[in-house]
Amino acid sequence: MTQLHIVDDFLTEDQMLKIRSNTFLFENSEVETTGSYSWDEIKIFHPIINYLSEHFDLSNAVTYEVWQQENTRPLGWHHDKDEKLWESGELLFPILTSIFYLDVNVVSGGNLFLEDDTVIEPVTNRLVAFGPGVEHYVEPYSGSRHSIIINPWDRFLAS
């Protein structure tokens, strides 16, 4: 598998509070709906992206796909990809996939499984990042789980 980064206690308490109270999440609160944003539109997530740029080559990033999973999960094993192009059979991946666990209170389940059998527990203030094209799965869970997915792209997404 390509690079894997797992960082606990990633943001400061102040940064966490700023994300929780920022209007971006409320204005884009439609869970599981992705949006494509410029660098300037997602300032609240710059600490995350700045870290990612230290460990992945983001020099060609032109847009950032951002969405949240709040007490939801994707069904089944999947790759993060350009969904519109996939409808016509073309498979293109982001530069990387990143998942930031904003708030987690899971009683059971909710682990992230990667194609190489890596299992990652969801933990509040944990950042997980891995390279392109990695198939992954979130197991069913009970409790609450709020994650933010930020995927940098080196091309604009199909519309």
Model-flagged regions — what are they?
Residues 57-159:
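Catalytic core of non-heme Fe(II) oxygenases with the double-stranded beta-helix
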